[in-house]
Amino acid sequence: MAPESFAVTEPCIAAIDGGGSKTLLVVLNSDGTIANVEQTGGTNPFDQPLWRERLTGLLQLLPTSTQAVGLGLAGYGESATLCARQEDAVSESLGKIPYSLTNDVDMACSAAFGGEPGVLVLSGTGSMAWASDGRGQHCRVGGWGSLFGDEGSAYQIGRNALTLLTHILDGRNTQDSAFLEPFCKTMGLPSDPKLCTSALLEWYGNLEHPRSAVAALARHVSTLAENSCIPAAALLNTAATELAAHIRAARTKMPDVELPWSYAGGTLQSPFLRNAIAAQCGTPVSPLLPPIGGGLLTAARQAGWTPDASWITSLARTLGAAGLGS
């Protein structure tokens, strides 16, 4: 934060969207303008040893005039022990500032539907679906973590791409050789199988945070799929089937209300992936707000503001103009 940002004295609110690979802070003035944006690394306590330092570091940047904060944190509500640690970190940092704390996917669902019924499927480093009936009842599907879950996530797509690459390199897969050269190019690896083998292991051995690095490969798979690379398209179609299963399960759990679906997370910025899910679950509803907007909406209500439909529309434009629309 620039030094002058500490001098902000007009009423403001803030939101934090804490994901597996990155964490975003947005401070919003009462006139609807953005006072500040900050970003740091992931804050999921399940696999980020520095999660507390990163989270409290952002919270310490808040202006003294902050009226309320809305937080959506990856991993929240999934382990009583870690949940207590997250709550402790937030309460210690915020003191008397009112706040709301929930799971990052719950926050994204509120943002997407503005409190109306719907099922939000999130695919970023991890994956999960969150459904709301608009009357206070919620359900979740997935979100079990990378060891035995996160189907359809960027991490799983990246890992499956690496598995495919290794099978091509050692001869177990001969029908998908068209994947070798373009994928190696995106990773900065030689496409010659003998050279690529050692280069890939070198890449692997130097990773500082393997889960995030593997998840980052998903965007390359998406680009290749958009450019008619058949093996890459197959990887995304597999992910789409997994994510569609999340949506169907949520709808089954709430049979008495119609649940349109929407999306959040970097992986689902891929038109190819969204279209593949739509083929199984119907056309998605464009989210009213990006995930961080859900935290700002909650904070605005908690601060006693009046965030009506026009306020939400204005916020969506403001966040989009600031490059925060996804």
Language model features with spans:
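Short beta-strand-loop/turn "lid" adjacent to the catalytic site in phosphate-handling enzymes
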Residues: 39, 44, 60-101, 110-113, ...
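Short, active-site-adjacent cap segments at secondary-structure transitions
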Residues: 77-79, 107-109, 128-129, 268-271
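Active-site nucleophile and cofactor-binding loops and adjacent substrate-binding regions
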Residues: 99-107, 122-123, 284-293
